[in-house]
Each structure stands twice: as C-alpha cells, then as structure tokens.
Amino acid sequence: MKIFSLLFSLFLLVSVMAENRIPAVHVPGSVGGTALCGEGALLYLAGEGKLQIYDTSVPSKPRKISELGGLPNWESRQILVHRGFAYLTARHRGVWIIDVRNPSKPLIAGTFDTAELATGIEASGDILFVTLRVFGVQIFDISNPVKPKHLNLHRTFEAQSAYCANGILAVGDWGNSTVLLLDASDPARPKQLSRIELDGFGDGVYIQENILYASTGHNSRKGTQKERKGAGHGLEIFDISNPRAPERLGGVKFPKFYSLGGDFWTPRPAGPLLAAADTHNGLFLVDVRDRRNPRITGRVILPEGNQKMADCVGGIVPGNGVIYLAGEKTGLFVAEVPESRPLPPRSGTLAVRTKSSAKEVPGFTRYECGGMVRRVRVSGNTVYAAASDAGLLVFQNTPQGLKEIQRITGNRIYDVDISGSLLVSAGNGFELTSYRILPDGTLKKLGSLRTWIPMQIVHLYEDGKIAAVSGGTGRVNFFDLNNPEKPVQKKYFAEKRILYIDVFPEQTLNGFLPISVHGMGLSWYHLNGTAAERLENNPSVQFHQLDGIAVLKDRFFIPSKRNGYYLLAPEDFGKAGLRKEFRADVPILGLPMWDGGKRLFLSDSRNGIVSEFDASSPEHLKLIRQVDVHPGTAGRAALLNGRLVIPAGFSGFYLENSKNSD
C-alpha cells in the first residue's frame, strides 16, 4: 500500500509539473556556459572562452552590448560582479578578473591562482570567497580588486558554492550532503557555527531575511542504495535566526535523476517564488510563501545539449517578469514568469579585521616566497620552488640558511622537475620550459613550448628524455626532451575521468608507469626512451583523488581509500597486490615520497600534515613522526642533505633545521 501511495504521489507530482511547463526562448548568439550573474540591468554570461554582457532594459529581450574573448572555455563555473569587476571561477585555471566598469568595453584585469579547483564565488565588502571542492573555502582580501591577497583557507569536506549575508557565510558542501554556517565577521579567522544535514548532495545556497534556501541533488540519505540513487534532488528551507541552531521549516523533492558531469544546483528568490536550477532536470519554480509547505508551480526544461538529454541549467538570474537561464551547451534563455522580481542589491560590508599568519613549526624554518608554493625540488645543495604567481625561485644552502640566488618571473609556475642537470617547469599559458642547471645552481633557459594543452604537473622519466604532463583534464601528455632546447609533443592519451592532482609516481619500475584516474582506478603505461604506450586500465579499485603513488623498493605504493595501502608489482599491473591491503598504526593518505632507503613520507595536502614512516619493511610501516604545517597545504616532500623540505602553498615552504636522527 505504501509503495502504491508513493507511486501515485509521484505520478501526481509529475502530472502537475507537466501541466505547468513554462517555455523558454533562446537568445541568438549566446554562448553555452554555466557562469551567469546579474547586476542592475546587466547580465554577464561566461562560456566557450568568452564573456558576453547583455542589457536587459527590455526584460524579455536581452541585447548583447559587448563580448570579450581570451577567457577559459569549459572550465568556467561561476561568475560574480562586485564593485565594477567580474570574478570568474575556472577550476584548475584559478579565478579570472574582468574590469566591467565600462560594460561596453570589458577588459581582462588579471588572474590569480587558488589552492585547488576554483568552483564557487562570493563577495562581501573587501572580501572574496572561493569554494575549492575538497580543500574548502579560500578567502581573499580584495580591497585592491585586481590584486587579491590570500587571507585564509578554511577546510571543509567538499565546498561547492557559498553565499554571505550579515557576516554569515553559508557553504554548500557537496558529497557529505550538508550546509555549513560560518561566522565570517573576521574573514581571516572564520568559525563554524553549525552543520546542517541535507537529504541530497549540497551545492547552491541563498540567505534571505534569516531564511536559508539550500538546493540539493544526486543521492538521498534515505532508503536502500537503489532507492537513494538520484533521489536527492530538491529544495530545503531553514530558519537561521539562530545560526548555531538552525530549524528546518520545509522542503520539496524534484524528480529522480543521476548523471555525472553537469552536477550542480542553485536556488534564487524570484518575487514570491523560489527558482531552483536542477541540472538536466531543468528549472523548478517553487511557491515558498508558506515555507513549511512549499509547492512546485512550474518547470522549465531546456532543449537537448549533446548528451541526448535536456541541457543542463547552470546559472539563473531572476528579472522583472522573467527568469534568465544559462544552458551549459545551448546558451542563454528567457522564461516568462510574471511574478518574478530581480534580486535586491547586495549590501555586504566585510573587511579585513585581523591578519592570518602561517604556522611556525618547531625545528623548521619557513621561507616566504610571495606566491603559492606548489612544489619544491632539490639538486645538490640547491632548492627550486615552483611558487605560482611569484615564479620559479632558486635558493642556495648556506651555513646561515637558504639564500635566494635567482628568481625567474613573468609567468605563473605550477610545477618543476629535475633529471640530472635538466630542470623543466610547467607554467601558465600552457608553457613547458627547459633549463640547464649551472654549477652554481642557477638556471640557464634552453627552450620552451607553448601549446593548447593545460600544464600543471610535470614529471621527468627515462633520464630526462621524456616528460609526462597533466593539467586538470583527463589527458596524459608525453613530450620528447631528447633535444631540451626544442621540446616536442610526442603523444597523448585520453583517460575517462580527470587527473585530479599529482597522479604520477616520481619514478618508473622497468619502464612501467601507473597513474591514478579519479573514479576509474589505475591506468598502466610503459615508457621506453621517448616512446610511451598505454597498456590497460584497471577500475576494480578506486583511490582518493588527493592520494598519489610512489616507488617503494621493487613495488609501487599507493594509499587505499580505507586508510590502508597497497603494494603493486608492475609485472601483473598490480592485480595480485590489489587483493591484499596493508595497514599501519595511523591512517595512510596523501602524496608519497620514498627517500630510496628506509624512509617514506606522506603529505596530506588537505589537512597540512606530513607523516614520516620507517619503511624498512614495506608491509609493516611504522610511524616515526608527523609534522603539522596547517593552515598550509602540504605538497610532496623533498630532502636536502637528509633534511625534510615541505612545500606548503600560501605558507611558502619549510626546511628542517637539522637532519632527523630517528
């Protein structure tokens, strides 16, 4: 009887929505994208490498007044206009700043790097919030709007979107199905006030007069695994008058749906209605005048994109009698909704109250680099730091400590690797650059190559003859460095999912190279000189996107998702090794580095902790110590004459004062 009632209710719900299908009119010439926002009578749409600005003086007929190229393409996620500047998140390509003070002539004013995938964007006064997925929320001082300064990185589970009102920052946390309420009145030191559980993956949030609207999607918390899948789509409403004790008022469910890729959802008030973008499900209009009993009054479904299903609804902007929708593939649409009204102007006034500071770690000296240190490499007595917007920095070891002897600027440097006297960097603008390390440790440029391929991770193999490169996409790229003055793209392979972080080991074993593909297990490659071959993919065991791989003696070491680890022999592509999971006395996670002897280091980037293990017996790792550099983001460790070197993102890098005797 219960099943019959549920099916009948679902039938009625779908029938009501079908009777209230609202047409949407396409705006010719508009680009496909998800990044859409409004400011006054203007609309800002970013996608396909462009920013388009529309005049909506006649609400039903947006008129394009300008278009700017040279922006990220599919990477663009969300856009916000604040004090005459548009801030556009672009995942691994950071945040882009566009000067829109003259809407008819927008100009790119700059870009800046973020600690992880720049996804959501929010601003209040002098403060900018960028949600970064598993690294949380990064907070910037934008009192100078074109030169943001890092203030803090507040860790959350998987931050997707954010909204700030009256000093309260609501964060839609994705995979753990929650909304976090933070006290952001002191932006450098946000404090969590409460954690709200949702019945669906968290994402878009909006605060209106102490009422929190939270859009949800993907899977529900309730029922069997089969019942939960795709049943998390909906809208939930909370009273946050007391942000430490939110009260759930009501909610409404949308039809079941599940598809990876275009998986984001957004709520925005539209007069007495609430407009909720729900990916390929379309846009739902919800009457929220009775917040304890909201009801669906209409639905907009976009035309098909390129997946034989309705296109994904990205950003939405309520207007006078209309709602504007961004189709991820199909462009801008206008739906007539007579009750709709524009959102009120923003009035946030947050400002920097205190300065955040990097941690001083006992036994270590911290070196500030002026940019986010993503990687350090060591050659002899010299340390090379890939310091993002600060460039490539070279430090010489002296009895008084490290001394900076060279700084190569002019490009954002994401990564660097060394083989013998060859150093190769991966930089912004899709640039691979090779250098010769001179006897004094300084660098002499040999050559460079600019391509259309994103480059953020680089590893050198086969005595520096070949470089493996990734850049936030699903491509594994190999470059021939036989002549380092003229790097040549040799071959590329397309994996099914993204290469999330540093997915490569630092060495191969007999030419075998496993890489971790997010959600798709291990792909095995074989290298021989400058030749690269993809052998097979084994998706049977999946790994966490922030864990890496290292050679450990005669096998590959990789953390499991259950705080253990595997030891994989290359001869059978690790199949036998995946049948036995080893354990240590502490959780095993992060980017591993083996010193070639008995020490193994694991850098937990998200939590800022580096763990050192005695790996004399790889099957029985023993913890020696842990070094906490939080709030820094610990990158893969290196050693300088036996002393630990830890890249720590916006905290610079740390060098151990003396060799650890344990």
Where do the protein language model's features map onto the residues?
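Feature marking well-ordered beta-strand scaffolds used for ligand recognition
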Residues: M17-D662
